[in-house]
Regions:
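Loop-to-helix entry and N-terminal half of a specific, functionally important transmembrane alpha helix
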Residues: 24-32, 326, 356-387
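Non-cytosolic membrane-interface motifs at loop->transmembrane helix junctions
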Residues: 94-101, 156-161
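Active-site-proximal inter-transmembrane loops
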Residues: 149-167, 316-329
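Membrane-embedded alpha-helical segments of multi-pass membrane proteins
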Residues: 41-58, 99-110, 169-179, 219-226
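Long extracytoplasmic/lumenal interhelical loops at the membrane interface
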Residues: 271-285, 297-339
Length: 387
């Protein structure tokens, strides 16, 4: 409680030293995790406004040094290529709109790095807001899971959460990943009596994502917790202790809930053993066909959802059939399909620059800087996005 009071007091003092414009946006930034609980649209508006506010702040203060960052320049190159491809697509107005809107994501990242999150106490306060949001979302998901289990203990359903779709675990597994990482790193760095609660909190986040049935989000969060456990301080004995607790916890979870375990083991084995005859491959395939048919400029940003039904079967050597979704459920296939070979290469360069910039921050030897490379490295790891 003393730490909480001290953090709030320090943040309050920090806000008083800022202009009303900057202080207002910092408070608005803190509200993000709670807005995310409402629905994704309010969260998307929040993210977009942060980006617009950052541009306005840079203009008012004449602070444009952030444009010199290598990852920002590679992002600009990729965006320029995407805009050109969108402009010459079969539906330029729609595709240009999608391409212009895409820039909100790197703008938000830049705003956090160079403006809103440039203060340690603000980062700690944001993590506290994330913790509140995680507890609330976990309550939603556990309640839904308990209700489903009470109605049919053997049902192999995925949770919908407050969003009504099948990927609510992405909120905890991806958006709240930094919280789990920091909790795990601090737990490893302290004697087990002092760090146990933080370690259990990180483990509970993993457990909640697992019961949603979302395998990729579960794997990503598990990997992030493990990497954070060895990226800050190396304590082999504590890693073994917490690893043993995690193993026991997962074993108990899968034995108590065999339907959850079946989705992660039996169903996964069936799908991966015959991948090229699975719905996952069928959703990726039309993106590959479109990329092969439009190798230079691609079909335009966001055009997969518009053109998928018209994408031909493609070459006979490309096994399987086409199955249309809003996107091909594979990030790198989508890059090649929508922006062509130049966008694909520029996108890879952008991703590499982001990871390298985050990794170089390890030289500062602070908790946050030592862990910063983990989220982009995992998020951009080649993976299906439909599971």
């Amino acid at each position: 409680m003393n730490f909480l009071r001290q953090t709030i007091a320090t943040c309050t003092y920090d806000l008083r030293s800022l202009s009303k414009w900057d202080a207002g946006f910092v408070l608005f930034w803190f509200a993000g995790p709670l807005l995310y609980l409402i629905e994704r649209t309010p969260a998307d508006i929040w993210l977009s406004l942060i980006g617009i506010g950052f541009i306005a702040h840079s203009t008012r203060a004449n602070e444009w040094e952030w444009l010199r960052a290598g990852w920002v320049r590679f992002t600009g190159l990729f965006w320029a290529i995407a805009l050109v491809g969108a402009a010459i697509s079969v539906n330029p107005l729609y595709s240009l709109g999608e391409a212009v809107a895409w820039i909100r994501f790197p703008l938000y990242a830049a705003a956090c790095m160079f403006w809103l999150g440039a203060n340690r106490n603000r980062l700690v306060m944001m993590l506290m807001m994330m913790a509140v949001a995680v507890v609330i979302m976990s309550g939603f998901l556990i309640t839904e899971f308990a209700a489903n289990f009470a109605l049919n203990p053997n049902a192999k359903t995925r949770l919908g959460g407050p969003y009504g779709d099948l990927v609510p675990g992405g909120f905890i597994g991806k958006a709240m990943m930094p919280l789990a990482m920091v909790m795990a790193a601090i737990a490893i760095g302290r004697p087990i009596r002092q760090g146990l609660l933080m370690g259990l909190f990180a483990g509970a986040m993993v457990g909640v994502v697992i019961i949603t049935g979302e395998r990729m989000n579960s794997v990503l969060l598990c990997l992030s917790v493990f990497l954070a456990s060895v990226a800050w301080v190396i304590r082999p004995a504590r890693v073994i202790q917490y690893g043993s607790l995690a193993f026991i916890g997962l074993a108990v979870l899968f034995m108590a809930l065999p339907n959850v375990g079946d989705r992660f083991w039996s169903s996964q084995n069936q799908e991966t053993s015959d991948y090229f005859n699975s719905s996952y491959w069928f959703s990726v395939r039309p993106g590959i066909v479109a990329a092969l048919d439009n190798p230079v400029t691609g079909i335009g940003v966001g055009m997969h959802r518009k053109l998928c039904e018209d994408i031909p079967h493609g070459p006979d050597w490309l096994v399987g059939e086409n199955n249309c979704h809003p996107h091909p459920h594979q990030f790198y296939v989508q890059l090649a399909e929508e922006t062509g070979i130049f966008g694909f290469l520029a996108g890879i360069a952008m991703i590499g620059a982001i990871i390298i910039a985050a990794a170089r921050g390890r030289r500062n030897n602070t908790l946050f800087s030592r862990l910063a490379w983990i989220p982009p490295a995992l998020m951009f790891m080649p993976q299906p996005s439909a599971d």
